[in-house]
């Protein structure tokens, strides 16, 4: 059971990281996020980024919550890899 969870997380974490990178890029291309790709990426990443945004608000026009989410996912990935 533990190996299955480690394998699942080792696949899920990079996918979430790519989705967050996609969200960052889409925020520059389509700030309103009205197309379907932007909405899907936002729905995937908001459960991770939303709580961070509540703890650390934007500074001016800069939202650092995606970067913090990437940092935390990276730490989680290191923990998962060391457990496996």
What annotation goes with each model-predicted range?
Residues 1-84:
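Selective transmembrane helix interface/packing segments
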